[in-house]
């Protein structure tokens, strides 16, 4: 039996001000790290511009913190266009951010594989080319179950590894094409599977955006509530780990002796305890297959507001340079790695 739609209970003011009120709070809390330009809160930029470095700009809708804006900071990203909940930022916002953070080495646009984002980033790129500012673009597309065609897959939590590698290469003062290649290397070696236990509530909608039965979960669901590959009874952590790893390793084979990074991501309302139970099961499966774990990341990296659930991302460590990128210290308002 399906749940009734869940009514909204959130700590907000007006639903229509949700995104701007959130941004106001971030700027108040972290004035030394981030700022906005063109009198537009949604033009989110680093406050510590580094001259001569390739600028990396991302963008996407509100509702996924720390994705997307949460990774703007030292040794990661330089700017983020912020859209309303689950909506794309505008081309004008992306353009204005680009003009602020660009410092002569060009710009890499790195964002999720969603139609509205692609359209607006492409428009911004055309505007920048008219200003003789060089750009390159790459989209995250790590969600294995969203499409059999790799080029049509959604970008979800695995984009973290693209941010990490591209940001590190840019911090090493790599060229625009070298930074793009670093992002591409992470993209080629990253796959994600997610699953939801409860829906989320979009503020302006006022209730849940889909329903699940009392003992039902959705396997393969997207971070905007896109349908998964199946809905069914809630499974154990070990069962979810096994099914997820079957899908990931079936799409991206990893041989015994190879090294991977593991990212266990909470979707917004899943306890740390549950995430670590899942982590243990995933790593046990990898060890049984002779696959070495180079580094593990556990926490909230790409959420869907208050959705309960998790995702598993595996990033195959291709070479020693990739290890250097993954290990590079970073510092943002939402994520620090020492």
Residue positions per predicted region:
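N-terminal amphipathic/basic leader segments beginning at the initiator methionine
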Residues: 2-56, 319-338
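Short glycine-rich or small-residue beta-strand-to-loop segments that form or flank ligand, phosphate
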Residues: 9, 54-61, 77-80, 106-115, ...
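Glycine-rich oxoanion-binding loops at beta->alpha junctions
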Residues: 64, 73-103
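Short, acidic/small-residue loops that bind anionic groups at enzyme active sites
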Residues: 80-85, 129-153, 289-293
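Mixed-charge interfacial surface used for oligomerization/domain docking
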Residues: 172-277
């Amino acid at each position: 039996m399906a749940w009734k739609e869940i009514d909204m209970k959130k700590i907000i003011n007006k639903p229509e001000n949700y995104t701007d009120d959130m941004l106001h709070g971030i700027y108040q809390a972290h004035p030394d790290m981030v700022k906005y330009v063109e009198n537009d809160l949604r033009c989110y930029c680093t406050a510590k511009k580094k001259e001569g470095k390739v600028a990396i700009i991302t963008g996407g809708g509100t509702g996924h913190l720390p994705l997307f804006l949460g990774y703007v900071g030292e040794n990661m990203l330089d700017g983020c266009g912020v859209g309303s909940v689950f909506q794309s930022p505008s081309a004008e916002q992306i353009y204005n951010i680009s003009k602020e953070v660009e410092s002569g080495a060009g710009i890499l646009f790195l964002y999720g594989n969603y139609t509205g984002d692609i359209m607006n980033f492409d428009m911004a790129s055309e505007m920048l080319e008219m200003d003789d500012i060089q750009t390159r673009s790459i989209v995250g597309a790590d969600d294995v179950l969203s499409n059999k065609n790799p080029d049509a897959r959604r970008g979800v939590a695995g984009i973290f590894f693209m941010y990490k590698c591209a940001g590190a290469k840019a911090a090493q003062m790599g060229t625009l094409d070298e930074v793009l290649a670093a992002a591409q290397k992470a993209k080629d070696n990253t796959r994600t599977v997610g699953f939801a236990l409860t829906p989320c509530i979009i503020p302006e909608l006022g209730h849940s955006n889909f329903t699940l039965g009392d003992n039902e979960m959705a396997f393969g669901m997207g971070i905007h509530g896109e349908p998964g590959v199946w809905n069914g009874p809630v499974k154990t952590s070990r069962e979810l780990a096994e099914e997820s790893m079957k899908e990931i390793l079936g799409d991206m084979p990893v041989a015994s002796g190879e090294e991977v990074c593991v990212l266990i991501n909470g979707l917004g309302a899943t306890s740390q305890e549950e995430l670590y139970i899942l982590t243990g099961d995933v790593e046990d499966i990898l060890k049984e297959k002779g696959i070495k774990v180079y580094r593990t990341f556990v926490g909230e990296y790409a959420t869907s507001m208050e959705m309960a659930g998790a995702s598993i991302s595996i990033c195959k460590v291709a070479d020693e340079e990739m290890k250097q990128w993954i290990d590079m210290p970073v510092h943002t308002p939402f994520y620090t790695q020492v």
